[in-house]
Curated annotation (Swiss-Prot):
Description of post-translational modifications: Trimethylated by ATPSCKMT at Lys-104. Methylation is required for proper incorporation of the C subunit into the ATP synthase complex and mitochondrial respiration.
Gene label: ATP5MC1
Keywords assigned by UniProt, alphabetized: CF(0), Hydrogen ion transport, Ion transport, Lipid-binding, Membrane, Methylation, Mitochondrion, Transit peptide, Transmembrane, Transmembrane helix, Transport
PROSITE patterns: ATPASE_C
Name of this chain's protein: ATP synthase F(0) complex subunit C1, mitochondrial
Organism: Homo sapiens (Human)
SUPFAM superfamilies in alphabetical order: F1F0 ATP synthase subunit C
Positions of transmembrane segments: 77-97, 112-132
Membrane topology, record value: Multi-pass membrane protein
Amino acid sequence: MQTAGALFISPALIRCCTRGLIRPVSASFLNSPVNSSKQPSYSNFPLQVARREFQTSVVSRDIDTAAKFIGAGAATVGVAGSGAGIGTVFGSLIIGYARNPSLKQQLFSYAILGFALSEAMGLFCLMVAFLILFAM
């Protein structure tokens, strides 16, 4: 005995539609019969839309976006470390100058060198954060 739903749906329709829903578009086009006119016939694939992108799920894209933001945030932490380093360098300059004012020129040149290195690391961290956000 067949149910009422099985009487109205032919097996050919079930095969055509479920195969199009389960298989990727590229596999369906590669296994389709070749037309004699060399023109692709889209009437054989009623439920498929030709797309030129990877078939990723919404959950996968959300995970990728969250990972991108987490990575950019972790790279931005280095900018705060750069600020702490600059504060330490100039704090040491003030302490050193207070202890021995005659070494003012040498202490200042070392402070500028420390500032430049610390600032370069901060800018490098910021550059990596922007690369993660906008280049990936």
